[in-house]
Amino acid sequence: MDKLIKTISASGAFRAYVLDCTETVRYAQERHHTLSSSTVALGRTLIANQILAANQKGDSKVTVKVIGDSSFGHIISVADTKGHVKGYIQNPGVDIKKTATGEVLVGPFMGQGHFVTITDYGTGNPYTSTTPLITGEIGEDLAYYLTESEQTPSAVGLNVLLDQEDKVKVAGGFMLQVLPGASVEEISHYEKRIQEMPAISTLLASENHIDALLAAIYGEEPYKRLAEEQLSFQCDCSRERFASALMSLPKADLLTMLNEDKGAEIVCQFCGTKYQFDQTDLEVLINDKA
């Protein structure tokens, strides 16, 4: 089971989240049939979204839109405060060769664009914030968003490692944030630690990457585990929801589906589940609409 662990330094000056999202990203790859680069880009976005949702309280939902002008198109993800996330990438077929060190390139194929977050508190007035893409590598873009939009200096590392067959081997990451009251010396100390940290891909390749991430962040310094939360890919789509969507269409469109198409098939963008509505189903909807 995937998990997110919330921690805080003994001094109370910093907090860190570390995540294992391997099963989540693996499931997303299976549902969307993504090729290598698309898998990594989508996976990083899902991880980033789970970090943002973990910062919220109550029954909030956070939507992340990574909107680029290059090969990937846009990536959309939605996460809630219960550890559930869903998402899709506009172009699942980007398959760029790895670098000499085995890294999968993402930034060059995201292009220029924006990192958009929409936080829904359930009050009917969602809050939207937009920052420019800095590198298109997702992790740096999330860190920039947190620092600029939420005014919380942050360091973020996240990645998806693939095996020889380009299947998800491991996925995860971390977020480190400065809390109010941190001294200049403490901030300087942690900045130096972050600069000296091994690459996120190296940490994820460790036998126990959760422990490796925590060790890289805190070293020998004491810290406290605040909570451990389970994470998973879970879509809330349903036949009833799509039936309601069909009901919202003009009657003429439903009649066209009935008489010309002999039915309708709706595919959920977020998870790929297909819902079939035969002629009898459409007749019921048309009658209910009358």
UniProtKB/Swiss-Prot annotation:
One of its GO terms (molecular function) is protein folding chaperone. One of its GO terms (cellular component) is cytoplasm. Disulfide bonds join 235-237, 268-271. InterPro entries: Heat_shock_Hsp33 (IPR000397), Heat_shock_Hsp33_C (IPR016154), Heat_shock_Hsp33_N (IPR016153). Signal peptide: none annotated. GO terms for biological process: protein refolding. Keywords: Chaperone, Cytoplasm, Disulfide bond, Redox-active center, Stress response, Zinc. The keyword Zinc applies. It is found in: Cytoplasm. Its main location: cytoplasm. Under oxidizing conditions two disulfide bonds are formed involving the reactive cysteines. Under reducing conditions zinc is bound to the reactive cysteines and the protein is inactive. SUPFAM superfamilies: Hsp33 domain, HSP33 redox switch-like. Gene3D superfamilies: Hsp33 domain, HSP33 redox switch-like. Redox regulated molecular chaperone. Protects both thermally unfolding and oxidatively damaged proteins from irreversible aggregation. Plays an important role in the bacterial defense system toward oxidative stress. Belongs to the HSP33 family. HAMAP family: HslO. This is 33 kDa chaperonin. It comes from Streptococcus equi subsp. equi (strain 4047).
